[in-house]
A protein has these predicted regions:
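Extended, folded cores of ATP/NTP-driven motor/assembly subunits in large transport
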Residues: 1-377
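Glycine-centered flexibility motif
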Residues: 21-22, 26, 380, 387-392
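Glycine-rich phosphate-binding loop of nucleotide-binding enzymes
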Residues: 48-52, 56-64, 384-434
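A short, compositionally biased
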Residues: 140-141, 382-385
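Long insertion/accessory domains within large nucleic-acid-processing enzymes
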Residues: 378-379, 405
Length: 434
C-alpha cells in the first residue's frame, strides 16, 4: 500500500463550527479559538500619548481577565487596495467627476483581528471538559464586554467570514474581491507563491539580547523641535514595494507558580557562574521577580512576527527598510529565521500554541509584551449628515464634519465658525454650499 506523504498544510485545523452562540475554530491539537474583528482605537498621527497608554491598559485588562491557560493573538493586516466610492446615479456632475478622479487609486487599508485561544491538554487524545468549555465562553463574553465598555469598535466573525479569513491567509491575498491559490515553494529565506515572495521577520532572537532595556507603549519622534507620540511600528503602513504586511502578535499565559519556581532556580544557577553574561541574566531575573512581587503583572511567552509579501526582486530593499526602521526602535530582528514555512503555518489565526517553545517564544512580562502590539488605525470618514470631503495623507477623499457639532462625535457645541484662505481659493463657494 502506497504511503501518502503528509503536506505542510494538512490538518492545520480540526473543525469550524457554530456552537453555544459563538463560531469556534478548533486547531489540529484541539485548541478552541474565537475571532473578533476590531478597529485599533488610536488614530495615526494623533500625537496623543495618553491614547496609546489607555489602549495598553485595555489589553492588559484582557490578559488579566483571560488568565492562565489562554493565549491572546492579534493580527494587523496592512494591505494595498484600489479606491472605489459608490456614487448615486442621480448625483451631480461635479460629484461624479470628483470621485471618478480618485477611482482605482492605490491606498493602504488596516484590518485588525483579535483572537482568543484556550490551551488544550497535552495528551494523545483531546478530552472534553464541560467546566473548561463553559469557562472559555465566559471569558470570551467578558472580553466582548470589556471592548464594548471602552468604546472599541469590534464584532464577532460569522462562520463564513472565519472560513474566508483562513483561506485568504493561506493564499496571502487580502485585496477585496475574488482570490486564488497557487503552489508554494519553501526555502530557508522565504516562501515563493507564484511571482510573489513571502518572508517572515521575527522581532526577537532568543539567543541574543537585541531589545531596548526600556520600552513604552509608544515611540517619540521630533517634528520641528517638538516631541510627538507615535506607534512603535507606524512605519508598517509605508513598507516599499510590498502589497501586503501581516503583523502577527501572540501572547501565551502559562501557569505562573510553576514558572516562578523555574525562574528562581535559574537565577541561582546564573549566580554560581560569575561571568558578565550570567551576571546580566541574574540581574534581569531578579528584577522580574521584584516586579511580580509588587505589581499585578503576568509572566507570558510571546512571539512577534512580520510577514511581508513583495515581488521576488524586491526582497533586499524591503529587508533593508525594515531592519533600518526596527534599529531606530532599538530592535534587531532575528537573523536565524530559517524555518520560514514553520513560521508561516504557526502564524495562522487560531494557531497561537503551535510555536516551538525552544526557539520561537521568549519569556517576558505582560506589560512589556503589550508595548509591541500595534495600536493605530488610519484616518477614515466621519459619520455626519453634513458631508464635506477632503483628501487625507494618502491622497484619498475622506468625509469630515467641518462644524464639529453635526457628526456622531461632537467636537464642540458652538455653531460659529469662519473660513480662512487666500484670494480665489473658494471661501465664498464653500460657505454658500454649506
Amino acid at each position: 500500500m502506497a504511503h501518502t506523504r503528509k503536506k505542510a498544510f494538512d490538518g492545520l485545523y480540526a473543525q469550524l463550527e457554530e456552537t453555544d452562540g459563538h463560531v469556534v475554530l478548533f486547531s489540529a491539537k484541539g485548541e478552541p479559538s474565537i475571532i473578533f474583528e476590531m478597529t485599533n482605537p488610536v488614530q495615526q498621527l494623533c500625537t496623543d500619548a495618553e491614547q496609546y497608554v489607555r489602549f495598553q491598559e485595555v489589553l492588559g485588562g484582557v490578559l488579566q481577565t483571560l488568565g492562565e491557560g489562554y493565549a491572546l493573538q492579534k493580527q494587523d493586516i496592512l494591505c494595498k487596495q484600489s479606491y472605489h466610492h459608490e456614487v448615486p446615479e442621480d448625483a451631480e456632475f461635479l460629484t461624479r467627476s470628483y470621485f471618478n478622479y480618485f477611482e482605482g487609486r492605490e491606498f493602504t487599508e488596516i484590518r485588525t483581528y483579535l483572537i482568543v485561544t484556550q490551551e488544550a491538554q497535552r495528551s494523545q487524545f483531546v478530552q472534553y471538559d464541560p467546566k473548561k468549555w463553559l469557562d472559555f465562553h465566559a471569558k470570551v463574553a467578558k472580553v466582548d464586554d470589556m471592548l464594548a465598555e471602552k468604546h472599541i469598535r469590534h464584532r464577532l466573525l460569522t462562520k463564513e467570514e472565519v472560513n474566508e479569513y483562513c483561506h485568504r491567509f493561506m493564499a496571502f491575498q487580502f485585496r477585496h474581491g475574488s482570490f486564488s491559490m497557487t503552489n508554494f515553494k519553501a526555502s530557508d529565506e522565504y516562501l515563493k507563491i507564484g511571482s510573489r515572495i513571502i518572508r517572515s521577520y521575527p522581532l526577537v532572537d532568543i539567543d541574543e539580547i537585541n531589545l531596548p532595556s526600556m520600552v513604552k507603549p509608544y515611540a517619540q519622534m521630533s517634528v520641528n523641535g517638538y516631541a510627538i507620540a507615535t506607534d512603535l511600528f507606524s512605519f508598517l503602513t509605508q513598507v516599499p514595494f510590498s502589497d501586503c504586511v501581516v503583523f502577527n502578535q501572540v501572547v501565551q499565559i502559562p501557569e505562573q507558580r510553576k514558572l516562578l519556581r523555574k525562574l528562581q532556580g535559574k537565577a541561582k544557577r546564573h549566580g554560581s557562574m560569575p561571568d558578565p553574561s550570567n551576571k546580566i541574566a541574574k540581574a534581569d531575573i531578579e528584577e522580574v521577580l521584584d516586579r511580580l512581587a509588587v505589581d499585578s503583572t503576568l509572566l507570558v511567552y510571546s512571539n512577534f512576527n512580520m510577514l511581508v509579501s513583495c515581488p521576488a526582486d524586491k526582497v533586499t530593499p524591503v529587508t533593508s527598510y525594515l531592519e533600518t526602521k526596527l534599529y531606530e526602535c532599538g530592535i534587531m530582528p532575528s537573523k536565524s529565521a530559517y524555518n520560514q514555512l514553520e513560521l508561516f503555518t504557526d502564524s495562522f489565526p487560531g494557531n497561537a500554541y503551535a510555536f516551538n517553545p525552544d526557539y520561537d517564544l521568549f519569556l517576558t512580562l505582560s506589560d512589556a509584551a503589550l508595548c509591541f502590539f500595534f495600536k493605530e488605525h488610519l484616518k477614515g470618514s466621519e459619520e455626519t449628515p453634513l458631508t464635506t470631503y477632503y483628501t487625507d495623507r494618502q491622497g484619498l477623499p475622506v468625509c469630515i464634519d467641518i462644524t464639529g457639532k453635526e457628526g456622531k462625535v461632537k467636537m464642540t457645541d458652538n455653531a460659529n465658525f469662519f473660513c480662512i484662505g487666500p484670494s480665489g481659493s473658494g471661501k465664498s463657494f464653500l460657505d454658500n454650499s454649506t
